From Swiss-Prot:
<dbReference type="GO" id="GO:0071949">
    <property type="term" value="F:FAD binding"/>
</dbReference>
<dbReference type="Pfam" id="PF02873">
    <property type="entry name" value="MurB_C"/>
</dbReference>
<comment type="function">
    <text>Cell wall formation.</text>
</comment>
<feature type="domain" description="FAD-binding PCMH-type">
    <location>
        <begin position="26"/>
        <end position="189"/>
    </location>
</feature>
<dbReference type="Pfam" id="PF01565">
    <property type="entry name" value="FAD_binding_4"/>
</dbReference>
<comment type="similarity">
    <text>Belongs to the MurB family.</text>
</comment>
<dbReference type="GO" id="GO:0051301">
    <property type="term" value="P:cell division"/>
</dbReference>
<dbReference type="InterPro" id="IPR016167">
    <property type="entry name" value="FAD-bd_PCMH_sub1"/>
</dbReference>
<dbReference type="InterPro" id="IPR036318">
    <property type="entry name" value="FAD-bd_PCMH-like_sf"/>
</dbReference>
<dbReference type="GO" id="GO:0071555">
    <property type="term" value="P:cell wall organization"/>
</dbReference>
<comment type="pathway">
    <text>Cell wall biogenesis; peptidoglycan biosynthesis.</text>
</comment>
<dbReference type="InterPro" id="IPR036635">
    <property type="entry name" value="MurB_C_sf"/>
</dbReference>
<dbReference type="InterPro" id="IPR006094">
    <property type="entry name" value="Oxid_FAD_bind_N"/>
</dbReference>
<dbReference type="GO" id="GO:0008762">
    <property type="term" value="F:UDP-N-acetylmuramate dehydrogenase activity"/>
</dbReference>
<dbReference type="GO" id="GO:0005829">
    <property type="term" value="C:cytosol"/>
</dbReference>
<dbReference type="InterPro" id="IPR011601">
    <property type="entry name" value="MurB_C"/>
</dbReference>
<keyword id="KW-0285">Flavoprotein</keyword>
Length: 294
């Protein structure tokens, strides 16, 4: 690489195949994959880097294009996957902690209100970025404070949930961020009741979603006043198949890679669905799956 990389304590890996990391099993190579040792290491990288920086989490809601990711791709590792109690109704979690682990940890601590997270296969950082939600609840309703590093200046900031300016599947912060820690609020409850709610969340997910397939969660956000899956279904796209990827018959807002599809195959199929909904309803669906790369 012609441009030198900042001296850091974390780990650089070069020309990393992203198809082995993503839930959809697609994507080209990342030029450089970096896992920081700690917050200071991350800040140092951002302040000194001469290459563009991208951020990935669990890659459970992402299509990485076949040409891969140029520059430096940051992925928080186990050093940021901690979950700990602050008091009897609050939990602090690192950006790399899985949302499902957070839900079950809360249950073990007899803290209720986070059960819906058990069905979301992403990280705390990714969930904060997209205001992840399920079954009528979302991150905005349970997060208190968030710590984030700005990807432009490399400085550390703290925000309240109100300062984030959350809305459906997004937030209002200007600029680009990597979310490294958050404090979540709940209410004290009995363990058996929480366990039952966790079971209900997982049962509902298993019954309504293609959990055994290669997928990346919901393809599109719900437009105001309607459900994306219903628009897709009524546009004749349930089960739409291009030979390597298809729209799930079980839940038609899910895209499946079932026969070694490429990222382009998946993206093209999603855009066919967008076009069909636009033609029938004059509604422009917005991708919920994040598309990354050239």
């Amino acid at each position: 690489m012609l441009i030198s990389l900042p001296k850091v304590c974390g780990i650089y890996r070069y020309n990393v195949s992203m198809s082995k990391m993503t839930w959809l099993n697609v994507g080209g190579q990342a030029d450089v994959l970096f896992k920081p040792r700690d917050i200071e290491d991350l800040m140092c990288l951002i302040k000194d880097a001469e290459l563009p920086i991208s951020v990935i989490g669990a890659t459970s809601n992402i299509i990485i294009r076949d040409s891969g990711i140029r520059g430096i791709t940051v992925k928080l590792g186990k050093e940021f996957a901690y979950i700990k109690c602050k008091d009897n109704s609050s939990i602090v979690a690192g950006g790399a902690a899985l949302l499902s682990n957070l839900a079950y940890f809360a249950g073990e601590q007899q803290i209720s209100g986070l059960e819906f997270l058990a069905g979301i296969p992403g990280t705390v950082g990714g969930g904060i970025e997209m205001n992840a939600g399920a079954y009528g609840s979302d991150i905005a309703s349970v997060v208190k404070f968030i710590r984030a590093v700005n990807l432009e200046d490399g400085n550390l900031y703290e925000f309240s949930s109100e300062e984030m300016g959350y809305f459906y599947r997004g937030h209002s912060l200007k600029g680009r961020w990597i979310f490294i820690e958050a404090e979540f609020k709940g209410v004290s409850s009995e363990y058996e009741l929480i366990l039952q709610r966790l079971k209900e969340v997982i049962d509902k997910k298993n019954k309504s979603q293609p959990v055994r397939g290669k997928t990346a969660g919901c393809i599109f956000k719900n437009p105001i006043g309607c459900k994306a899956w219903k628009l897709i279904d009524e546009s004749g796209c349930r089960g739409l198949d291009n030979g390597v990827a298809k729209i799930s018959k079980k839940h038609c807002n899910f895209l499946l890679n079932y026969n070694n599809a490429t990222a382009l195959d998946l993206e093209n199929l999603g855009n066919r669905v967008k076009d069909a909904v636009k033609d029938k309803f004059n509604i422009e669906l917005e991708w919920e799956i994040r598309v990354l790369g050239r």
